[in-house]
Amino acid sequence: MSYDRVKDFDLPELAVHLQPHGAVMIDRKSMFYFRLSGRGAQLAFLLSKNKNLHKTARIWEIMKKEEMSADQLKEELSAHPFTEAWTEGLLDQPLHVSGSLDSYLPISCTLQLTNACNLSCSFCYASSGKPYPEELSSEQWILVMQKLAAHGVADITLTGGEAKLIKGFKELVVVASSLFTNVNVFSNGLNWRDEEVELLSHLGNVSVQISIDGMDNTHDQLRGRKGGFKESMNTIKKLSEANIPVIVAMTINESNADEVSDVVEQCANAGAFIFRAGKTLSVGRATEGFKALDIDFEEMVQIQLREARHKWGDRLNIIDWEHEESSFTTDFCTPGYLAWYIRADGYVTPCQLEDLPLGHILEDSMADIGSPARLLQLKCEAKNCKCIGKIELSEPDLPFQKEVKAGIQE
């Protein structure tokens, strides 16, 4: 992937996303977010509109009857590196506004286009293989994407099963690219046609994640497909040569933990953009005979990643094993509250690991699916999603909240 393309991806596209208890500022491209106080959100709106510290400070003085000079405002914003960047031109652009004050609407969604898969991985969290009895059609998925885009979703992941197995995949990825800032396709890397690679290269905002779970024999054995490693690595190379960002994901277990450095080297040579390793989770098919990774194996992986970062870090972004859960792939994904997983049958869950639904994407409104009451109930009852139970909401602190409560007074 060329550095020019990386630069294009790094240009911010800022938005303020409102929630019942507050606001977050999001870069809709990187999907990193920063939670704002009500005061911070108001200042962000003002700076984005007039692009001037002096004007913003004076507007604040007149509206709030509170002493505020440009120097005082600059000092206040300089207390944090992110808000300090506001004083240096970060907000010299329109701010997109999305969200709801009544419900928790997502900024990112994963669409399981089908549960069908052409592999039979022993650790598949979705137990993929056969499609569900009543899966959404391509036409219905287009309606879903239009609904999500209309409610401010910026980031979409198309997954499966194997996402490419749905009839109309090319049409769906074009629709997704047209409606959303980022599109991520999760694939096993098999059966990619040249025209599909070309299509994604023209779209310009699509990345592909491909799973590589060891070297030749190990990968093929774990995924139940002879020759799968070679074909998937060739796909990574073709996508990278077409300037499509490729993320390689490796699911670690005892049988492949000693092959991490070799896989990283293969990925660097194939032109991949990012490599990340994740632990096998006790869900789906992996529950049968599941054994958590021993500390010795974890340390082995960490050592290999450090060495690989030293060797290949100038060519490949290698995500730190210790911080994998807070990396770019999950940092913004507060399950249920900022991110939804939509199963192939249309039911919405907080993440791909959880079976309990919040509602149905075509039968229920977005407001009902994201209602605080439903989320609180699922937060208490979730069986597999460990993250949602750890979410602690702050006291409500919304922009213009004081004006609403106090009323407008002269």
Swiss-Prot record:
Spell out the GO cellular component terms annotated for this protein, sorted alphabetically and separated by semicolons: cytoplasm
Flavoprotein as a keyword of this entry, yes or no, is no
Q: List the Pfam families hit by this protein, alphabetically.
A: Radical_SAM (PF04055), SPASM (PF13186)
> Which residues are involved in binding [4Fe-4S] cluster 2?
C380, C385, C387
Phenotype seen when the gene is deleted: When the skfA-skfB-skfC-skfE-skfF-skfG-skfH operon is deleted, increased rate of spore formation; a double operon deletion (sdpA-sdpC plus skfA-skfH) makes spores even faster.
Q: Which GO terms describe its biological process?
A: bacteriocin biosynthetic process
The free-text cofactor remark is:
Binds 2 [4Fe-4S] clusters. One cluster is coordinated with 3 cysteines and an exchangeable S-adenosyl-L-methionine. The other is coordinated via 3 cysteines and maybe direct contact with the SkfA precursor.
Needed cofactors, names only, are: [4Fe-4S] cluster
Q: State where the protein is found.
A: Cytoplasm
Summarize where [4Fe-4S] cluster 1 binds, as residue positions.
Answer: C117, C121, C124
EC number(s) on file: 1.21.98.-
Give the induction note. By Spo0A and PhoP, during nutrient starvation, especially phosphate starvation. Repressed by AbrB during normal growth when nutrients are plentiful, in association with the transcriptional repressor Abh.
Boundaries of each Radical SAM core domain copy? 103-314
Would the keyword Nucleotide-binding be found if you checked this record's keyword annotation? no
Q: What class of enzyme is it?
A: oxidoreductase
Provide the function of this protein.
Catalyzes the formation of the thioether bond required for production of the sporulation killing factor (SKF) from SkfA. Forms the cysteine-methionine thioether bond found in SKF; the acceptor amino acid can be hydrophobic, aromatic or a small hydrophilic amino acid but not a larger hydrophilic amino acid, i.e. Met=Ala, Phe, Leu, Tyr>Asn, Ser>>Gln, Glu, Lys. The relative position of Cys and Met in the substrate cannot be inverted, in vitro the thioether bond cannot be made in the absence of the SkfA propeptide, suggesting this is the first reaction in SKF maturation.
PANTHER family assigned to the protein according to its UniProt record, in alphabetical order: PQQA PEPTIDE CYCLASE, RADICAL SAM DOMAIN PROTEIN
What other note does the entry give for this protein?
A: Accelerated cannibalism by skf- cells is seen on solid media but not in liquid media.
Q: Which family does it belong to?
A: Belongs to the radical SAM superfamily.
Alphabetical list of NCBIfam families matching this protein: rSAM_skfB (TIGR04403)
Stated name of the protein:
Sporulation killing factor maturation protein SkfB
